């Protein structure tokens, strides 16, 4: 979400990482933890492997056979879609970097600062008067790429169901939330910059962590319903098994919600979100339409894993560490840039909002360069949730079939280097292999049919 607009509506089971390094990237780390609430329980121990469990074939051969069931044309289409995102990652970075440089070199940023100072003498209102036109300029200049990436291209690959006007309406809602959330954040950050010009990086980290906590708390209740309707799932044959898994893992909710995501996308998704009384289990209507009960159980157990394994708190901690390092490096680079170009750009100091494009450029560049490492952190938590999910649901074939469905828009069999750099979730191949390893080790012949080995698809 895509990366990724400010308040992403993507669920964690299929989230994408497309980074747009502007001031919005200072907010973007919230996306990783919005759907992973802060609460922890022990991970249930996997059942003991049955001695001598028969298998028709080994896990490696079964994995290869499952991958071979995907027709070549569908595989090529999926690969082309996902590999195109590698380039979009670069184009988004280059575009927003160019915008930041343009705002500095043209002194538009300095003129916005001058306008804000003429409009009011109140410091916090000056930041607001600067931030609103700044966000408007950035949104306008990035709109063509946003339109291609999130509307035209999604329709090109058959992943979107929304016509332009409803899509544009949601973009406007997202922009309004960016204005509100981004302005509040900038007011707080610039108050820190003024009061602690040398140690601002440490205090700014604390501000960002508090902001992220706020987003995690309010998103399920106040933000996500702006884009989708959540209704109680009225199918007990589906909700009862999900709630049984939730009760077994002490997840404090008594209801499952259905999300009307099919009016926007063909993707399947689900999440367990919220904390402090806002916890909610939700799955989208595409998942209900396209998946069997074993597949749904596999997905929901994975999402419960994020909750039970306390991934929200862990990722918030990792985010705090990354922010502290990023802000510390940004301070050094910002001061160096100021000594060389500050007068030319009309930027006075870190406390001057005219320096916001420089701050965004430096921090966004660091974020862009750190993409492989940030993706790895998230990918590790996703693999932990996969392990929890398969132990909880005991649905290895369901996990495999969902991985293949996600393969409609995620490359199933990337190279190790691709997976390290670009994947914030385990690849389909990795998930299928985990499921087959688990099935071979944990399901005795009396509990499950012999290791299912699909026949390769004979189409092209």
Question: In which residue ranges do the predicted regions lie?
Answer:
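N-terminal acidic, proline/glycine-rich, low-complexity intrinsically disordered segments
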Residues: 2-4, 37-43
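Polar-ligand-bearing catalytic/cofactor-coordination segments
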Residues: 41-106, 110-350, 360-460
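Cleavable N-terminal signal peptides
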Residues: 27-28, 38, 389
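C-terminal segment of classical bacterial N-terminal signal peptides
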Residues: 31-40, 217
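Bacterial N-terminal signal peptides
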Residues: 22-34
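N-terminal secretory signal peptides that target proteins for export/translocation
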Residues: 1-20
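Helix-loop-beta hinge of the Bergerat
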Residues: 353
């Amino acid at each position: 979400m895509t990366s990724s607009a400010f308040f992403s509506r993507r669920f964690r089971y299929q989230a994408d990482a497309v980074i747009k390094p502007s001031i919005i990237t200072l907010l973007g780390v919230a996306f990783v933890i919005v759907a992973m609430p802060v609460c922890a329980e022990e991970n249930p121990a996997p059942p003991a492997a049955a001695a001598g469990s028969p298998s028709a074939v080994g896990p490696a051969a079964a994995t290869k056979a499952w991958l071979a069931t995907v027709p070549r044309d569908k595989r090529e289409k999926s690969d082309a879609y996902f590999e195109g995102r590698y380039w979009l990652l670069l184009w988004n970075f280059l575009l927003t970097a160019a915008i930041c440089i343009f705002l500095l070199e043209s002194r538009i940023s300095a003129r916005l600062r001058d306008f804000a100072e003429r409009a009011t003498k109140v410091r916090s209102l000056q930041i607001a008067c600067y931030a609103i036109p700044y966000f408007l300029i950035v949104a306008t200049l990035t709109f063509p790429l946003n339109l291609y990436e999130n509307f035209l291209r999604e329709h090109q690959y058959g992943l979107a169901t929304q016509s332009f006007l409803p899509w544009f309406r949601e973009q406007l809602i997202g922009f309004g939330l960016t204005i509100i959330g981004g302005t509040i954040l900038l007011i707080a950050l610039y108050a820190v910059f003024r009061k602690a010009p040398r140690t601002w990086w440490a205090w700014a980290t604390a501000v960002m962590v508090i902001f992220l906590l706020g987003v995690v708390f309010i998103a399920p209740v106040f933000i996500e319903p702006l884009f989708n309707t959540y209704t109680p799932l009225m199918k007990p044959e589906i909700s009862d098994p999900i709630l049984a898994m939730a009760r077994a893992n002490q997840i404090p909710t008594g209801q499952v919600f259905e999300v009307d995501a099919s009016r926007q996308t063909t993707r399947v998704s689900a999440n367990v979100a919220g904390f402090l009384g806002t916890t909610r289990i939700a799955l989208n209507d595409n998942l209900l339409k396209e998946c069997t009960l074993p597949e749904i159980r596999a997905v929901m157990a994975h999402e419960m894993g994020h909750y039970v394994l306390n991934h929200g708190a862990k990722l918030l901690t990792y985010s705090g560490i990354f922010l502290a390092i990023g802000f510390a490096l940004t301070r050094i680079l910002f001061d160096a840039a100021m000594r060389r170009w500050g007068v030319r750009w009309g930027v006075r100091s870190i406390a001057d909002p005219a320096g916001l494009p420089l701050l965004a450029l430096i921090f966004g560049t660091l974020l862009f360069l750190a993409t492989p490492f940030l993706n790895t952190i998230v990918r590790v938590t996703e693999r932990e949730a996969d392990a929890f999910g398969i132990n909880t649901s005991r649905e290895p074939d369901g996990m495999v079939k969902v991985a293949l469905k996600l393969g409609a828009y995620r490359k199933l069999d990337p190279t190790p280097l691709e997976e390290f750099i670009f994947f914030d979730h385990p690849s389909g191949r990795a998930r299928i292999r985990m499921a087959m390893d688990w099935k071979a080790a944990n399901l005795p012949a009396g509990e499950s049919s012999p290791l299912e080995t699909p026949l390769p698809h004979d189409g092209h």
